[in-house]
């Protein structure tokens, strides 16, 4: 049964509506996880470290797609809630076209930036060569990956979250199968892992382009449009929190790698990469929920339905709290098998990964609330507060903590830094929620 944005959402309906977005985000995160798993076990530790070292740069660039997707879908959903369907499709079309053209230009520039960025991150010798090789291959599909990030949000706004899920599942399975074929069977090494990801990203980005470009049964369709400078600026402002989250994460991940190189060498970077893979999957649950529920919030905000805003906010906080505790418990239980799966071939690296993940996992108790808080304000078209939460969470607090805490606790200080930064951010998020309760009437 099709669920519409205008409906009243029970727990069952809310979970049914956001579930495809959660799975979409999980499969998106699997791209890099599967690459890392095969590279670590079939190519070697140095190539594995190279993937982890250059990935923050690539993810930071692709974050522009998340910015346009989340910021633009909030505007489009609000416009639909106001009953302006034709105008909503104009905005949607403009944003997709800008992403496609901009993505091609950015991909070409990124080809030349991979080498200096890898050097900046501390790569040299064989590690540098692997970073350049893998990074330039992934630049090929950068426009498609940016479009995929845009369409993840717009599939939900179009009331087609299940179609979006199917696209991402097909893309993810393609990546996994080709990783196995290229790396494990044909022994193409690091290039094989890179091209497997490229193929998956092309499917995830181009299929939605064809779907929305033709006559379809959704609320949205690509067509003729005009340049709306104010809407583009509002999209960038509104989605700046998501851009800040991804860009800052890339900067912070690079800083973590530098600190780990200092305290644990190449093993530290490899251990951090393994931990990040699980972090991507766990946190993607919260990001998926935020993406899936945001258009509902935007729609009812546009329709001035305060009772439904309260209903959505209260249910969301309870769901996130339940997932937070569950993920923390799961993380503690899987620390040993996780380390065995990725780095069981090296006892020292195994111990470093296992102990590091158990300390890192305390962040899962908190980060879901901060992710939702930022996305909630984006959905309410308050890009400033959303961006401020993301800026403090992903850049200011994390940089400060990861630079200072290791001076006191050594390598354990690196693993604990994220949880401390999330706790500091939660204080800020909670303050904004209380201060703005009378403005948006969600409490």
Would you name each region that the model predicts?
Residues 1-18, 76-143, 185-240, 297-363, ...:
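Short alpha-helical transmembrane segments in multi-pass integral membrane proteins
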Residues 21, 25, 37, 41, ...:
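Transmembrane alpha-helix boundary and packing residues in multipass membrane permease domains
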Residues 30-48, 118-125, 181-188, 247-277, ...:
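Helix-terminus/linker motif at the lipid-water interface of multi-pass membrane proteins
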Residues 60-63, 175-180, 205-209, 280-284, ...:
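Hydrophobic transmembrane alpha-helices of multi-pass small-molecule transporters
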Residues 6-43, 56-71, 75, 79, ...:
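N-terminal transmembrane alpha-helices
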Residues 16-35, 137, 171, 200-204, ...:
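Transmembrane helical elements of multi-pass membrane transporters/channels
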Residues 69, 137-156, 167-175, 193-206, ...:
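Short runs within selected transmembrane alpha-helices of multi-pass transporters and secretion channels
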Residues 48-108, 145-163, 271-335, 367-389:
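Small-residue-rich hydrophobic transmembrane alpha-helices
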């Amino acid at each position: 049964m099709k669920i519409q944005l205008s409906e009243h959402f029970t727990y069952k309906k809310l979970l049914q509506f956001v579930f495809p977005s959660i799975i979409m985000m999980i499969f998106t995160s699997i791209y890099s996880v599967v690459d890392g798993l095969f590279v670590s076990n079939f190519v070697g530790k140095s190539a594995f470290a190279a993937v982890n070292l250059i990935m923050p740069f690539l993810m930071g660039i692709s974050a522009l797609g998340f910015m346009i997707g989340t910021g633009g879908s909030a505007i489009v959903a609000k416009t639909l809630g106001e009953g302006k369907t034709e105008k909503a499709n104009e905005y949607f079309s403009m944003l997709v076209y800008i992403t496609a053209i901009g993505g091609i230009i950015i991909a070409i520039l990124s080809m030349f930036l991979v080498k200096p960025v890898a050097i900046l991150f501390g790569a040299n010798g064989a590690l540098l060569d692997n970073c350049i090789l893998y990074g330039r291959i992934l630049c090929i599909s950068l426009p498609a990956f940016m479009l995929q990030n845009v369409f993840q949000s717009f599939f939900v706004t179009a009331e087609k979250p299940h179609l979006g899920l199917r696209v991402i599942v097909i893309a993810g399975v393609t990546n996994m199968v080709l990783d196995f074929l290229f790396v494990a069977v044909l022994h193409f090494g690091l290039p094989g892992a890179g091209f497997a990801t490229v193929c998956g990203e092309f499917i995830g980005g181009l299929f939605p382009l064809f779907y929305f470009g033709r006559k379809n049964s959704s609320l949205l369709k690509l067509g003729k449009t005009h340049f709306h400078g104010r809407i583009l600026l509002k999209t960038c402002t509104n989605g700046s929190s998501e851009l800040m989250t991804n860009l800052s994460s890339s900067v912070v991940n690079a800083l973590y790698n530098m600190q780990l190189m200092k305290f644990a060498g190449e093993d530290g970077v490899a251990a951090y990469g393994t931990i990040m893979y699980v972090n991507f999957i766990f946190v993607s649950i919260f990001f998926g929920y935020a993406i899936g529920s945001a258009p509902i919030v935007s729609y009812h905000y546009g329709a001035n339905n305060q009772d439904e805003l309260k209903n959505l906010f209260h249910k969301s906080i309870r769901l996130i709290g339940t997932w937070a505790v569950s993920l923390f418990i799961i993380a503690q239980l899987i620390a040993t098998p996780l380390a065995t799966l990725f780095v069981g071939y090296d006892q020292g690296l195994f111990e470093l990964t296992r102990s590091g993940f158990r300390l890192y996992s305390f962040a899962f108790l908190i980060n879901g609330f901060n992710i939702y808080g930022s996305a909630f304000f984006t959905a309410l078209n308050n890009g400033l507060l959303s961006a401020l939460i993301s800026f403090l969470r992903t850049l200011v607090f994390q940089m400060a903590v990861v630079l200072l805490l290791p001076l006191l606790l050594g390598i354990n200080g690196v693993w604990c830094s994220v949880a401390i930064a999330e706790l500091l951010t939660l204080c800020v998020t909670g303050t904004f929620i209380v201060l703005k309760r009378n403005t948006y009437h969600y409490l």
